[in-house]
Amino acid sequence: MKEMMMSNMFNDVPTPWAMFFQDSATPNMEGMLELHNNVVFYLCMMLGFVTFMLYNMLTTYNKSVMPYKYLNQGQFMEMMWTTLPAVMLLMIAFPSFILLYMCDEVMAPAMTIKAMGLQWYWKYEYSDFMDEKGDTMEFESYMIPEDLLDEGQLRQLDVDAPIVCPVDTHIRFMVTAADVMHDFSVPSLGLKIDAVPGRLNQMSALMQREGVYYGQCSELCGVMHSSMPMKVEAVPTADFLAWIDEQ
């Protein structure tokens, strides 16, 4: 597994002029990519069929002054242009329903991370870990200003306190907000959860490889909306437990 990871370079950050998705790191995101590819395939089939029919009509029926002289009714044609789109829509709908159910289903999570959006930073809480006083572990995460970035850090993406998660672990993310609507979104993990004041939304993730994943608030929340990035570090379980002990 490690040899495969070392021989591949994954795109887990936004890049200039990007034309496709970031590389997936969870089964949910892998399913979204597969659904997208299938939908694009069906759309290309429909585009090709419609283009062929238009070309055929323009070239065939222009040869006669009265092209519809012997065409009294077109029941077969009407049946086909009703049935084919319906079948294609069903082929798109059923996989999307299955994926939607899988993304919403949170099955026996090993740990829970709560994320609260505030203007304009994130606050995280590890509900399963407590200190000697019995308080849960929590911290605030702010974007690093451009003039304080170190070499290799990303502008408007790096934060002073990232989320650290163990790989190959079912993690439940519970998201809410304290003031206005925000959105917790990490593309490589297939996470996009609305943060609504007074409401808890949840979604699960199973990170299948180590890496650093970036996201940004995807709900317009005010003048500093672009200053609410999120950074997720997926590390081995031993490194995660060592990080917990340091907090």
From Swiss-Prot:
<dbReference type="InterPro" id="IPR002429">
    <property type="entry name" value="CcO_II-like_C"/>
</dbReference>
<keyword id="KW-0460">Magnesium</keyword>
<feature type="transmembrane region" description="Helical">
    <location>
        <begin position="39"/>
        <end position="58"/>
    </location>
</feature>
<feature type="transmembrane region" description="Helical">
    <location>
        <begin position="79"/>
        <end position="103"/>
    </location>
</feature>
<feature type="binding site">
    <location>
        <position position="219"/>
    </location>
    <ligand>
        <name>Cu cation A2</name>
    </ligand>
</feature>
<dbReference type="Pfam" id="PF00116">
    <property type="entry name" value="COX2"/>
</dbReference>
<comment type="similarity">
    <text>Belongs to the cytochrome c oxidase subunit 2 family.</text>
</comment>
<dbReference type="Pfam" id="PF02790">
    <property type="entry name" value="COX2_TM"/>
</dbReference>
<keyword id="KW-0479">Metal-binding</keyword>
<dbReference type="InterPro" id="IPR045187">
    <property type="entry name" value="CcO_II"/>
</dbReference>
<feature type="binding site">
    <location>
        <position position="221"/>
    </location>
    <ligand>
        <name>Cu cation A1</name>
    </ligand>
</feature>
<feature type="binding site">
    <location>
        <position position="225"/>
    </location>
    <ligand>
        <name>Cu cation A2</name>
    </ligand>
</feature>
<dbReference type="GO" id="GO:0042773">
    <property type="term" value="P:ATP synthesis coupled electron transport"/>
</dbReference>
<keyword id="KW-0999">Mitochondrion inner membrane</keyword>
<dbReference type="GO" id="GO:0005743">
    <property type="term" value="C:mitochondrial inner membrane"/>
</dbReference>
<feature type="binding site">
    <location>
        <position position="219"/>
    </location>
    <ligand>
        <name>Mg(2+)</name>
    </ligand>
</feature>
<keyword id="KW-0186">Copper</keyword>
<feature type="topological domain" description="Mitochondrial intermembrane">
    <location>
        <begin position="1"/>
        <end position="38"/>
    </location>
</feature>
<keyword id="KW-0813">Transport</keyword>
<keyword id="KW-0496">Mitochondrion</keyword>
<protein>
    <recommendedName>
        <fullName>Cytochrome c oxidase subunit 2</fullName>
        <ecNumber>7.1.1.9</ecNumber>
    </recommendedName>
</protein>
<dbReference type="InterPro" id="IPR001505">
    <property type="entry name" value="Copper_CuA"/>
</dbReference>
<keyword id="KW-0249">Electron transport</keyword>
<feature type="binding site">
    <location>
        <position position="217"/>
    </location>
    <ligand>
        <name>Cu cation A2</name>
    </ligand>
</feature>
<feature type="binding site">
    <location>
        <position position="221"/>
    </location>
    <ligand>
        <name>Cu cation A2</name>
    </ligand>
</feature>
<keyword id="KW-1133">Transmembrane helix</keyword>
<dbReference type="InterPro" id="IPR036257">
    <property type="entry name" value="Cyt_c_oxidase_su2_TM_sf"/>
</dbReference>
<feature type="binding site">
    <location>
        <position position="182"/>
    </location>
    <ligand>
        <name>Cu cation A1</name>
    </ligand>
</feature>
<dbReference type="GO" id="GO:0005507">
    <property type="term" value="F:copper ion binding"/>
</dbReference>
<comment type="function">
    <text>Component of the cytochrome c oxidase, the last enzyme in the mitochondrial electron transport chain which drives oxidative phosphorylation. The respiratory chain contains 3 multisubunit complexes succinate dehydrogenase (complex II, CII), ubiquinol-cytochrome c oxidoreductase (cytochrome b-c1 complex, complex III, CIII) and cytochrome c oxidase (complex IV, CIV), that cooperate to transfer electrons derived from NADH and succinate to molecular oxygen, creating an electrochemical gradient over the inner membrane that drives transmembrane transport and the ATP synthase.</text>
</comment>
<feature type="topological domain" description="Mitochondrial matrix">
    <location>
        <begin position="59"/>
        <end position="78"/>
    </location>
</feature>
<dbReference type="InterPro" id="IPR008972">
    <property type="entry name" value="Cupredoxin"/>
</dbReference>
<keyword id="KW-1278">Translocase</keyword>
<feature type="topological domain" description="Mitochondrial intermembrane">
    <location>
        <begin position="104"/>
        <end position="247"/>
    </location>
</feature>
<keyword id="KW-0679">Respiratory chain</keyword>
<dbReference type="InterPro" id="IPR011759">
    <property type="entry name" value="Cyt_c_oxidase_su2_TM_dom"/>
</dbReference>
<feature type="binding site">
    <location>
        <position position="228"/>
    </location>
    <ligand>
        <name>Cu cation A1</name>
    </ligand>
</feature>
<dbReference type="InterPro" id="IPR014222">
    <property type="entry name" value="Cyt_c_oxidase_su2"/>
</dbReference>
<dbReference type="InterPro" id="IPR034210">
    <property type="entry name" value="CcO_II_C"/>
</dbReference>
<keyword id="KW-0812">Transmembrane</keyword>
<dbReference type="GO" id="GO:0004129">
    <property type="term" value="F:cytochrome-c oxidase activity"/>
</dbReference>
<feature type="binding site">
    <location>
        <position position="217"/>
    </location>
    <ligand>
        <name>Cu cation A1</name>
    </ligand>
</feature>
